[in-house]
Each structure stands twice: as C-alpha cells, then as structure tokens.
Amino acid sequence: DSRGKAIHKYFRESSFHYVEKKIKKLSRKDMTTQSIYLQIALTKLNELDFEQRVMRQVKSEHKAVDKSTITKSIMLITKCLMDKAIFSDDKSDVNWIGVFAGGESENATWQVRPLDNYLYEGLPGVAIFFAALNKIFSDDKYNQILEGISKALFTYTDEMYLRQRGSENESSGVFCGEASLLYTYEILYQLTSEEKYITYSKKQIEVVSKIVNSDQYFDIIYGNAGALLAILNMYKVFPEKKYLEMAISIGDSLIEKQEKNGGWKGKTSANELAGFSHGASGISYALYRLWHLTKEKKYCVSAKRGFLFENSLYDAQEGNW
C-alpha cells in the first residue's frame, strides 16, 4: 500500500501464472490470427499498389432478391461477428479487434486495435446490428451481445457525464463524436423500447452540450452539423425546450462560421469541402432540418448558400464534384 506494507493474498494468482495460463490456451488458430495482425500492422498503406480510376457512370440493374437470400446474407454476417467476438470470462463484456487506417497520408499505416465507442468504426454500430437482429430473430445469444456492448457504452457515458475537465477536446459529430452515442441510444430505444436507452440518451445529450461550443469541424461526421441532427431527433421524441434551445444555438454557430462563398472550412481543411460527410451539403442538410422545425428564415438561407457552393464545384465533363 502507500505505506509500503505488503497486502498478502490480494490477487488470486500471480501475473506470471496468469500469462502462463493464457499461453497454454492458445491454439494454431490464434497463431494464424496473430500472424495476420502482425502482417497488417507492419504494412504501410502507401506500399500497396492501388489502381486509381475515375468512375464516370455507374450502371446498376435491379434484380429481385427473395427473403431467403437476404436472411442467408444476414446470418453470414452474424456468424462472422459471433466467431470473432472476444468475451470476458463471465461473458458480460464483449469487443472485437478491428483494422483501421491511421497516420498522415504519406506515412499512413494500418492500426490493429479493439473497436472504440463511436458509431463510425466502433461498438455502437455492432450494437444496432444485434438489436435489430434480436428484434427479428429473437435469440438469447444476440441479446447477450447487445447487453455486453450496452454495458461498455453506459460505462463510457457515465464517465463522460461526470468528467469535469477535458470534454471540450472531444468531437461532437454524429458518427465520430459524442453525438454518435446519443444517436445510437435513440436507435436502440426505437428497436427495443427499453427505458434504459432513454435514460442514457438524456445523460449523453448533457455530454454533447459540454462539447458543441468548442467544435471546429462543423461537419456531419466529426462536428456540430452531426450533433444538430441527433439533438433534433431527441427533441422529436422529447419536445423539451432545452433541447430546442441547444439545436438553435448550434444552428446559429454554424451560420456564424459559414464562409463568404457559402462553404465551411473545418479545423483540418485547407479549403471548404463538398460532400455530405465532411462538406457543405451535409451541414446544409442539418440547417435545413432546423429550418423545417423552427421556420426561421436564416437557417433556410444559410442552407441554400451551402447547396449553391456545393453545386459550384460540379464538373459537367467529369460528371462529378
């Protein structure tokens, strides 16, 4: 302890024996998996030879797909997730090892790590999948995974809710930010009708409220446009004045940050971007949703300016933006 006194029999086994026991459980399958992870981790993205082509037109022929084919595909995805799930000893916690691109473009590498707590590349998306799966096919093992993920997400929200400092450094977006958990809880409530997801929606929106004033991205993925959409969804379910006021505050901030040409320049962008994920059309869509609710003309005007900027980047010859 802090006074240098040894506390005997605190741990059930020594660190050495724990590691030894873990090694004895490993199989050839584990060796193959670890070899793949090592190979991926040591490979730089720019060492791979990609053929870059401009797709001028995509032709798709609609083919009718029967229910059995859809079900078969769903079950293949489910089996893959179930096979690769990593559970705690008591099965109350679960996660997966994912592969993600990281680093600057010139020195980008693959990162091998557990899924994070955001929707874009983390546990929330898997939770939504298993919630929908359990609603349709009703199986205890699907619900067990949903409960395990929910436990991890609730723990994260509780920690963020109680955090006094540092929250302003987090992203606010609806896919790679704190609003992604709010959006996830909203969806999980719709799928399960369980009140605990409403409880945590109300906690998470308080977390989001501490972050939105520091946003420097503005977009759907990382920034306040995404947060705005999640908050508008919350207001639709619970029309409390404070949620509307939060949405209006974000909308006003987005208008204030809009450039003269109608676009938005995020923290890491040299220029104003186009597109729904990081660019003007996504931000404009969020503002349009706010206008549809409030009927405040300024949000509609700002959204139109954003769409006009987006369309100014269209290249008719390439058939693309």
Annotated model-derived regions:
Residues 118-125, 174-180, 223, 279-282:
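Glycine-centered tight-turn and secondary-structure capping sites
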Residues 140-184:
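Helix-terminus loop motifs that line ligand-binding clefts
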Residues 58-64, 124-139, 180-194, 228-240, ...:
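Well-ordered alpha-helical scaffold segments within catalytic/enzyme domains
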Residues 1-121, 125, 129, 163-173:
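Regulatory N- and C-terminal appendages and interdomain linkers associated
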